[in-house]
Amino acid sequence: FLAVDCSPAGDIYGDQGAIGEGTLIRFFDPGHLMLPNMKDFLLTTAEEAGIKYQYYCGKGGTDAGAAHLKNGGVPSTTIGVCARYIHSHQTLYAMDDFLQAQAFLQALVKKLDRSTVDLIKNY
């Protein structure tokens, strides 16, 4: 399961999540901890596809937190974009980050097959 979401930018305060630094790969949030093989799959795919990315550990949750509990466990992750003023009527993000996230999702879907899912689940 690939959740697509915006996460709050913390770059003004020197925290993680910088606008303009690429798509987000969320390894952890209070409702979800990524499987180690999912992490490997994401990082390998990003490197192979030349995707600009940044690590992110969120304080809020995403749909990946609910999805990974369904049907005996669904491998899940969140791919996102850093933004300011999320949950408001005026969200601000970098278009290049959005395009990197879009390209990353396309690369992931092209590589994702049954054997890859089985490998991800084998922790």
Question: For the regions a protein language model found, what residue spans apply to each?
Answer:
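Active-site-adjacent substrate-binding region
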Residues: 24-102, 107-123
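Acidic/histidine-rich catalytic neighborhood of metal-dependent amide-processing enzymes
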Residues: 1-26, 60, 116, 120
